[in-house]
A protein has these predicted regions:
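ATP-dependent adenylation/nucleotidyltransferase module used to activate substrates
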Residues: 1-176
Length: 176
């Protein structure tokens, strides 16, 4: 499988969805797990590639041989791409919401915060336990499954609220 080609296809899809919705960026629920970390990273790469400013070493074809671009070559390419882009083009944003409960894994929370820092993401941490407790105080015989489902619904509501606030699309992740 050609993973670079697959990544480009996914990044193109992300950009297409955001552009077609005329959104300014994406909102993602970041748990610290692999699924949300991968989606956040793909969104960042998608938006960077749309601006012609992908970071890191990039491969290129040179007479049939794969070589690595130097930092200077990448900087020159980035400057050239910026010169060609419209002056009013805005960088698409990524806003991460970290929404732990009292039962959330502390290591995952730490991982989510580290990912936000390493990807330079705008983020907000919202402790959803008080919201969960207020709702559960009105319910009868709450089991673990109902608590888990309610936590997911609260997170979804917050994601869509921030989506509307910022003019962003919600990017979903699975929990597999």
């Amino acid at each position: 499988m050609d993973f670079e080609k697959l990544e480009r296809k996914i990044c193109d899809f992300i950009n297409s969805c955001v552009d077609n919705a005329r959104a300014k960026g994406v909102v993602i629920g970041l748990s610290g797990g692999l699924d949300s970390a991968l989606v956040a990273t793909l969104c960042q790469r998608a938006f960077a590639s749309a601006q012609g400013s992908a970071s890191g070493l990039q491969s290129k074809e040179n007479a049939g041989q794969s070589t690595l671009q130097t930092d200077k070559e990448q900087a020159d390419k980035k400057a050239s791409a910026q010169d060609e882009s419209p002056k009013n083009a805005e960088q698409k944003g990524i806003f991460a919401l970290i929404m732990p409960t009292q039962n959330s894994n502390k290591a995952n929370l730490k991982d989510a915060l580290m990912l936000c820092e390493s990807l330079n993401l705008e983020y907000k941490t919202i402790e959803i336990q008080p919201i969960l407790d207020a709702f559960l105080s009105e319910c009868e015989s709450v089991c673990k499954t109902r608590m888990g489902n309610l936590s997911a619904r609260i997170r979804m509501s917050l994601l869509y609220d921030y989506s509307a606030l910022k003019g962003y699309l919600v990017v979903g992740t699975s929990n597999k």
